[in-house]
Amino acid sequence: MNNIAVITGSNGMDAKTLTHFLLSKGYKVILTYRRNSFFDEGNIKKHFIKDLMDNPNAELHLEVCDISCQNSVVECIKSILKRHSRIDELYLLAANSHVGESFKNKELSIQTNGMSVYYFLECLKNNSPKTKTYFAATSELVGGTESGAFNENDKWNPKSPYAIGKALGARWIDFYRNSIDSNLFCCYGILFNHSNIYRSKDFAIRKITNTAAKIALGKEKELKLGHLEWARDEHWSDFGCEAMWKMLQLKSPENFVVGNGETHWGEEYVENAFSFFNINWRDYVKFDDSLKRPNEVVRLIADPINAKEKLGWIQNRISFKTHINLMCKYDYELESGMNPERPNVFSL
């Protein structure tokens, strides 16, 4: 019998990545999406044709859900239960995920990143209390550290509406896990920066690798960035999604910090990307103050010791240089009009 997993945020990087992972394990995956003029069911399903061919017992379904509306959440969960009888695992990955944009619509960030968690957990308490739930929190909760690394016991200091919304969502997880009248199996993961070829070009790492590829092909003349005085702890998203799944396989729910524990400054990102194409980045990178984020978080580094001990998390399964190279290679092939394959990092 297939395990049944519901994943919110069908267009997002982690939702696509986790769907690949779960289909490879023979899951029945139900992706939720918000009905709008930009949604293309065929465009979503095309990513998973090979997974479904390789795993004939796996299934993929789509379900409408507006996570910012409680009635829509309830209708979605009840519809899934009616059609598929149960929900074994729920992954709350949908979010208003661009930190800079969250300053322009603070209320939406709180609604989608925080209150949506309440909507789902309250619905599960009343309709599917045995469902195990994972919520994607964020390293932006940290607010940055001048030195050292962040673990599960450190204090939060959210500096953006995005992070404040995620903080609210995480508190709802703790409340419903520990509440006498619910006692749900629910947890959150604080995944530090992670990316793969599904990362949007609105994010720094993909903007850097994609623009470097375009410059190498003569399709762009420069890369505009706000600045490079920031440091992040970057891992490949496939490994982070595996950690999400492992959290829900534990006997008791627990929150985890996930990351490589390595510091990489902005200059390292551009240096590695442009070096892949044998280009001097200083000739092409321009700085524009209008691209700087308000309340910029300078340094975000993880201490994943708990994940190592309890989830079998392995730090630095691929090097930072390999990470950047894989994205650069993919972007070069993509911008060359080829049909590049998604890297199978588990085989590296």
Residue locations for each model-derived region?
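C-terminal amphipathic/interface module of NAD(P)-dependent oxidoreductases
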Residues: R299-L348
